[in-house]
UniProtKB/Swiss-Prot annotation:
Residues 1-23 form the signal peptide. GO terms for molecular function: toxin activity. It is found in: Secreted; Nematocyst. Induces neurotoxic symptoms on zebrafish. Has also been claimed to be implied in calcification, but tests on homolog proteins suggest that proteins of this family have a neurotoxic function and not a calcification function. Contains 4 disulfide bonds. Keywords: Cleavage on pair of basic residues, Disulfide bond, Nematocyst, Neurotoxin, Secreted, Signal, Toxin. Transmembrane segments: none annotated. The keyword Signal applies. This is Small cysteine-rich protein 4. It comes from the Eukaryota. It comes from Orbicella faveolata (Mountainous star coral). Residues 24-25 form a propeptide. Belongs to the Cnidaria small cysteine-rich protein (SCRiP) family. beta subfamily. The keyword ATP-binding does not apply.
């Protein structure tokens, strides 16, 4: 019985450790975005617009280095070429 309890506690501890690591990574990404470390927000002006992910209209190309506020949106940049 003691072995089962010990195993259960180890499983719970492992799950909490993984959950903490994932949420910590999300906080680090948010912090990096706020300070310009990874990528910057799509401007939503004439040259950069947020559209549904993977659906840039004619004259625009996908700009993966910029992000929109929603995971279902992607930034599209005016394609000058």
């Amino acid at each position: 019985m003691d072995t089962k309890v010990a195993c259960l506690l180890l499983i719970i501890l492992g799950a909490l450790t993984v959950q903490g690591a994932v949420s910590g990574n999300k906080r680090m990404n948010l912090h990096a975005r706020q300070w310009g470390g990874i990528e910057r927000e799509c401007m939503n002006n004439g040259e950069e617009q947020c559209f549904p992910m993977g659906q840039c209209p004619g004259g625009f190309r996908e700009c993966s280095e910029y992000y929109c506020g929603s995971p279902s949106l992607g930034c599209c940049c005016w394609d000058e070429w």
